[in-house]
């Protein structure tokens, strides 16, 4: 079984169209969106979910130009439930949840050929690339915006919860209904006329309700007037429940109609009705209601399925929700008409939770498997599906009968497992709200603009909104990094008034007499920039004469270690660091920078050595390397050192980068000479060292925090080997177990700079040594 990230990547691997059916490939936008989704799936953080929303809105421009036209709509959802959700008994995050739903749908589309065919047959776009493009567009709208109406349900639920806390459940309790609904959902005459032209077979379209009921009539055959009546009744007369799905559909419709040149189509109407149906509409007591088949409404079918299955890594706000355990990750196996999901729970839960104190919704372990295989599956696919599938071991709790949300045309298998979750401990972090990040990114762009005006050959677009998506994200990534950079010098920022010392002069920290924080942070900024460029498909290269040619080829001469940068380029990193303080203070929501010694983990340096050439599978060796590194990460601030020779050294560095660790390079020659020497050594040893191998080595070295040359012209390799052993606390060695030694006339071993010599030196110095066995030719 695979992770959602691995499963989702297939969609982008096969996608050839990203910016429209008449452009066969816009690789930058495609890579930006894929990178944003991958980053979010690795972190689960809201600020990374925000970048997914931004990429989608920038690519498709469904609300007008770019992200700014829908900024408030999305960010207010997150802000509102953050501040209001704690007043409820049960409530979990919907902002990041929607991005998970988006990614899960992409994974199902990529791996389930039956669903792809159903979508293609339903919409008939022609070739697979065009189908994938339009699926991405309309599925993105459905999934990312399906919960934007949740604040309406929150307001209703808060009053209900308040009354029940005081008087208990009582028919005499107050409940909220929303006034002025007819004006809120009304459509002006021009919009109504355009809708009549688009849907000539429909009745008048004076309200959004009429439009929604028409869409349900066309796709599912629901009687239009009956649906209109139920929509109004559920909003104005509902005591126990307010359907956020209805308000999500209404808000999205209003937003679409606010765009000057927007033209409604049946596809957009399918988006709206899919959102309307996803929560509880098929439970309305309306004529002709029934489970939805994929052939009737593919977008609705998929949203209901993914929305129900997304039951992991959801931040809890409500009192009971905070107490309920929830899976922190999943593993997937998707094929034609088959989905197998394993929900992974933190292994500590059984020890720390008492079953008797948990809510009825989820009782962990022995009962949870029964719940998801029984009630959970039955709610999606119906009780008949459970009864017809003896492979599902458990029966329904209390023998409840569920009609099901969707027609069961797939095999759905759900499991649970335990796996220890690695904790990221942080005492206090900066308040990285979405308002901060987007506005901060614009300030960074303005600052960079002002600086570059004085540089020959520099051209930067004055308007942030007109920047290519790649450069907008670059500024946002810089803004996101401010939190980590401040933490490195014992600071954080927040818009709250807190009882910590306020920093009034950041330069006193940056230019500290006891520590060169400026140089350190500049190095960190360069490494961040290098990793960003590499993740977007850029490479090291010098074969260009203009910025336009450089950007077209996606090559850059500055993808090198910080030490090799010209002073002009180093000054750009310094600009970012020195601008942190002034840019944060320019934000409108009263941001302050506070000083707080955070009690860092003890620092430990791990050296990596090993053979240049071995015949074992590198994946298994990488797993072992990461296992040892992760052991030390739990309790230490880990720095990895290596000489970056071909083979094991570079493999260890690669693993360290994968884990987000700081890496230092200690090389025996100057940079260019060493790369040449590594290539020649490989050729002498009978191994092909290709241009791709050299480029990979350059890219690895460019990500190092320090690239230091150990100067010893006579014993260069021996000196470098001894240097990293002397500096390290722990040695990880990829070794074949053979002690190859040479002795001098006094019968003392000679340091040849080889793997065994490093192991021997470390053991003689009583340093911890971890050996990972390998085989050599």
Listing of model-derived features with the role each one plays in the protein:
Residues 1-75, 291-296, 300, 306-309, ...:
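C-terminal effector/catalytic modules and regulatory tails appended to multi-domain proteins
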Residues 67-82, 214-228, 452-461, 549-559:
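Active-site-adjacent bridging/hinge elements
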Residues 90-109, 240-248, 471-474, 569-576, ...:
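Phosphate/oxyanion-binding active-site loops and adjacent basic polyanion-contact surfaces
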Residues 374-599:
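Alpha-helical propensity feature that highlights long, continuous alpha-helices across diverse contexts
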Residues 598-776:
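Acidic/glycine-enriched connector segments
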Residues 95, 99, 136, 140, ...:
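Short, well-structured alpha-helical segments
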Residues 2-186, 203, 210, 218-219, ...:
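Acidic/His-rich, divalent-metal-binding segments that scaffold phosphate/diphosphate chemistry
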Residues 128-331:
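Divalent metal-dependent catalytic cores for phosphoryl transfer on phosphate-bearing substrates
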């Amino acid at each position: 079984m695979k992770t959602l990230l691995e499963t989702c990547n297939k969609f982008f691997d096969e996608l050839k169209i990203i910016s429209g059916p008449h452009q066969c490939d816009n690789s930058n936008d495609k890579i930006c969106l894929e990178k944003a989704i991958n980053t979010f799936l690795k972190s689960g953080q809201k600020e990374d979910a925000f970048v997914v929303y931004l990429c989608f809105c920038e690519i498709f421009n469904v609300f007008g130009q770019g992200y700014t036209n829908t900024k408030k709509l999305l960010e207010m959802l997150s802000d509102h439930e953050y501040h209001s959700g704690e007043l409820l008994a049960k409530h979990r995050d919907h902002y990041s949840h929607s991005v998970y739903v988006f990614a899960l749908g992409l994974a199902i589309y990529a791996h389930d050929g039956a669903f792809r065919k159903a979508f293609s047959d339903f919409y008939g776009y022609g070739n697979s690339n065009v189908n994938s493009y339009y699926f991405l567009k309309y599925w993105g709208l459905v999934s990312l915006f399906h919960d934007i109406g949740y604040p309406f349900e929150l307001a209703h639920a808060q009053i209900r919860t308040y009354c029940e806390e005081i008087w208990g459940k009582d028919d005499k309790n107050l409940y909220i209904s929303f006034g002025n609904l007819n004006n809120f959902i009304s459509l002006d005459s021009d919009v109504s006329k355009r809708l009549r032209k688009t849907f000539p077979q429909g009745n008048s379209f004076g309200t959004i309700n009429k439009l929604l009921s028409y869409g349900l009539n066309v796709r599912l055959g629901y009687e239009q007037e009956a649906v209109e009546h139920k929509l109004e009744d559920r909003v104005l007369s509902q005591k126990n429940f307010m359907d956020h799905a209805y308000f999500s559909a209404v808000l999205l419709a209003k937003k679409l109609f606010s765009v000057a040149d927007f033209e409604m189509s049946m596809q957009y109407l399918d988006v709206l009705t899919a959102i309307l149906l996803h929560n509880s509409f098929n439970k309305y007591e309306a004529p002709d209601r029934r489970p939805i088949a994929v052939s009737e409404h593919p977008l609705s079918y998929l949203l209901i399925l993914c929305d129900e299955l997304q039951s992991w890594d959801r931040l809890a706000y409500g009192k009971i929700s905070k107490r309920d355990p929830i899976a922190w990750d999943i593993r997937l196996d998707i094929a034609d008409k088959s989905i197998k999901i394993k929900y992974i729970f933190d292994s500590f839960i059984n020890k720390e939770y008492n079953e008797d104190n948990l809510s009825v919704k989820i009782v962990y372990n022995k009962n949870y498997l029964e719940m998801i295989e029984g009630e959970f599956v039955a709610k999606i696919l119906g009780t008949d599906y459970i009864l017809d599938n003896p492979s599902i071991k458990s029966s329904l709790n209390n023998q409840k009968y569920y009609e099901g949300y969707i027609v069961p045309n797939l095999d759905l298998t759900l499991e649970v497992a335990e796996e220890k979750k690695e904790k990221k401990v942080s005492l206090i972090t900066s308040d990285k709200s979405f308002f901060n990040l987007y506005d901060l990114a614009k300030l960074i762009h303005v600052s960079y603009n002002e600086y570059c005006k004085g540089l020959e050959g520099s051209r930067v677009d004055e308007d942030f909104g007109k920047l290519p998506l790649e450069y907008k994200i670059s500024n946002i990534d810089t803004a996101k990094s401010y939190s980590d950079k401040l933490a490195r010098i014992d600071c954080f920022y927040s818009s709250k008034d807190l009882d910590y010392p306020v920093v009034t002069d950041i330069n006193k920290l940056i230019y500290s007499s006891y520590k060169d924080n400026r140089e350190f942070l500049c190095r960190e900024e360069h490494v961040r920039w290098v990793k960003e460029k590499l993740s977007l498909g850029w490479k090291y290269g010098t074969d260009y004469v203009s910025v336009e040619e450089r950007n077209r080829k996606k090559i850059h001469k500055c993808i090198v270690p910080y030490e090799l940068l010209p002073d002009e380029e180093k000054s750009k990193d310094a600009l970012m660091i020195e601008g942190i303080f002034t840019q944060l203070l320019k934000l409108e929501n009263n941001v302050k920078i506070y000083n707080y010694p955070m009690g860092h983990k003890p620092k430990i340096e791990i050296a990596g050595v090993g053979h240049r050439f071995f015949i074992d599978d590198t994946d298994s060796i990488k797993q072992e390397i990461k296992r040892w590194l992760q052991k030390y990460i739990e309790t230490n601030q880990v720095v990895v050192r290596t000489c970056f020779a071909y083979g094991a050294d570079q493999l260890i560095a690669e693993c360290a980068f994968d884990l987000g660790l700081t890496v230092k390079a200690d090389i025996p020659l100057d940079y260019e000479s060493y790369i040449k020497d590594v290539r020649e050594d490989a050729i002498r040893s009978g191994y092909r060292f290709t241009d791709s191998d050299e480029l990979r080595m350059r890219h690895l070295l460019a990500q190092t925090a320090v690239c230091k040359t150990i100067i010893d012209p006579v014993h260069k390799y021996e000196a470098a080997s001894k240097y990293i052993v002397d500096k390290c606390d722990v040695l990880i060695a990829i070794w074949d177990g053979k002690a190859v030694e040479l002795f001098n006339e006094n019968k003392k071993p000679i340091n040849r700079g080889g793997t065994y010599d490093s192991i021997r030196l470390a053991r003689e110095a009583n340093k911890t040594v971890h050996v990972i066995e390998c085989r050599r030719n």
